[in-house]
Amino acid sequence: MSSKDQILEKDKKETDDNGNKKTTTTTSSSSSSSSSSKPRSNKFDKVIIKSNGVCYITEGVIGNGSFGVVTQAIVADTKEVVAIKKVLQDQRYKNRELQIMKMLNHINIVSLKNSFYTSDNDEVYLNLVLEYVPDTVYRVSRHYSMSKQPVPNIFVKLYIYQLCRSINYIHSLGICHRDIKPQNLLLDTSTSTLKLCDFGSAKILIKGETNVSYICSRHYRAPELIFGSTNYTTTIDVWSLGCVLAELLLGQPLFPGENGIDQLVEIIKVLGTPTKEQIHAMNPYYTSFKFPEIKANPWPRVFKAKDVPAESIDLISKILLYDPSSRLKPVEICAHPFFDELRDPKTCLPDGKPLPPLFNFTIAEQTSIGPKLAKTLIPSHAMNQIELPSPLFPNLAISSSNQSSSSNSNANVSSNLNSHSASPSTTSSSSSTPNSIPVQSPSTTNTTSSTTNNTTTTTTTTTTSNH
């Protein structure tokens, strides 16, 4: 089989390594897990869902994807707005998305509030009750693109920096997202807070264990996946991140391939033909090397039509590399000079509001930073924001008020003469459910996880709501 046939063949696969069969459905601009401030359907029958004593009133469909549907809903008692993602549950498998979501607690990751099962026509569905976030980076970027304006640099920096934090956090837990794209980056435009969503393709990668290569949305798919690698690492998320950064700067996808082979062609047009050594680094089992010799296109030329900061071009050149091991790590990306403006205490949003929380690093994040990077990543004015006890700064002590409550998003710290060294059990806690800083939303403290024995009832009301 030729190299072209090998790549095209992967576009025909219909199952993922969850064992789920992929189906083709109409996908909204916000994808299966993103949210919208307004439901997309003009008419929607309100449905009342009761689970574990909590009553949800669905308001409308806000997203459709290959694995399910997302509806906007209201918690009847509290009037809190949530998003409910409903996916078909294959009873032969545990739902990996639910198990992974239970592990996560980070300000830049959409939070899981509850989960329950429903049945319909002899099929079982898993319902994930998620934090509601009104917009996506995709829609914001498209708004600027349609207005023929670039996304302001301050927003590009904020979005990518927060995305790096979320990726660094999940990677510290061994989790690979495997579907980083603008549609999966939820955004609260009032605060510019970004939250990574849709962990339907996510997986804990184990060295020596094979994984499917047909994963990740095409325009953001790392070249090792196109070359059929089944032993890839979390660096595929870093490639996707670089593609998102380039897209925000260009106003369009950097590699707009129409199929597997065309995607590789688009990458080669920019990076040049990969060498045998680079192909071996991507997939040591790939044997066909029949590619036309094309020289790399210098990055400044790729962005020549745009007013793009030199630091951003330098950053992209260190991310979008064929050799996965040569790409910057997410935490190294955060420390890049491109983001120095965010570390300036005088920097604020264009409307004068303060920046969203950027330095409240969880213990899990800190274990991946290291003392050298910490000096760059955590400015002196933000030392009171990191989670304690800090493996980076053991001399920082938790005040008595914060010891009694772990719900504060910013730890109140003070200098202490008595050194508090982080114990091995503390620094290794990232391998289990992390003790991290919760999202600022008051509703976060109500987060619960239901069991498979949930009693759930569903009622469809006769009232039709117009949106």
From Swiss-Prot:
Binding site for ATP: 62-70, 85
Chain spans, region Disordered: 1-42, 400-467
Catalytic machinery residues: 179 (proton acceptor)
Effect seen on changing residue 220 to F: Not phosphorylated or activated by zakA
Every Protein kinase domain range: 56-339
Disruption phenotype: Cells grow normally in both axenic medium and with bacteria. Under starvation conditions, mutants lacking gskA aggregate more quickly and form smaller mounds than wild type, fail to form slugs and take longer than wild type to reach culmination. At culmination, mutants lacking gskA form abnormal fruiting bodies characterized by an unusually large mound-like basal disk. Prestalk B (pstB) cells are formed at the expense of prespore cells, and the proportion of gskA null cells that differentiate into spores is greatly reduced when compared to wild-type cells.
Example GO molecular function: protein serine kinase activity
PROSITE patterns: PROTEIN_KINASE_ATP, PROTEIN_KINASE_DOM, PROTEIN_KINASE_ST
Record key words, sorted: ATP-binding, Kinase, Nucleotide-binding, Phosphoprotein, Serine/threonine-protein kinase, Transferase
InterPro entries in UniProt: GSK-3, Kinase-like_dom_sf, Prot_kinase_dom, Protein_kinase_ATP_BS, Ser/Thr_kinase_AS, STKc_GSK3
Compositional bias of kind Basic and acidic residues: 1-20
Consequence when changing residue 86 to M: Inactive kinase
GO biological process: adenylate cyclase-activating G protein-coupled cAMP receptor signaling pathway; aggregation involved in sorocarp development; cell differentiation; chemotaxis to cAMP; chemotaxis to folate; culmination involved in sorocarp development; intracellular signal transduction; mitotic cytokinesis
One Gene Ontology term, aspect cellular component: centrosome
Keyword tRNA processing carried by entry: no
PTM annotation (Phosphotyrosine): residues: 214, 220
Low complexity compositional bias, start-end: 23-37
Cofactor(s) required for function per UniProt: Mg(2+)
Superkingdom of source: Eukaryota
Catalytic activity: L-seryl-[tau protein] + ATP = O-phospho-L-seryl-[tau protein] + ADP + H(+); L-threonyl-[tau protein] + ATP = O-phospho-L-threonyl-[tau protein] + ADP + H(+)
Notes on how activity is controlled: Inhibited by lithium. Lithium inhibition is competitive with respect to magnesium but non-competitive with respect to the peptide substrate.
Role summary: During cellular differentiation, may mediate an extracellular cyclic AMP stimulated signal transduction pathway that regulates prespore and prestalk B-cell proportions through inhibition of stalk cell formation and induction of prespore cell differentiation. The cAMP receptor carC appears to activate gskA via the tyrosine kinases zakA and zak2, to stimulate prespore differentiation, while carD appears to negatively regulate gskA, to promote prestalk formation.
Name of the protein: Glycogen synthase kinase-3
Organism: Dictyostelium discoideum (Social amoeba)
Gene designation: gskA
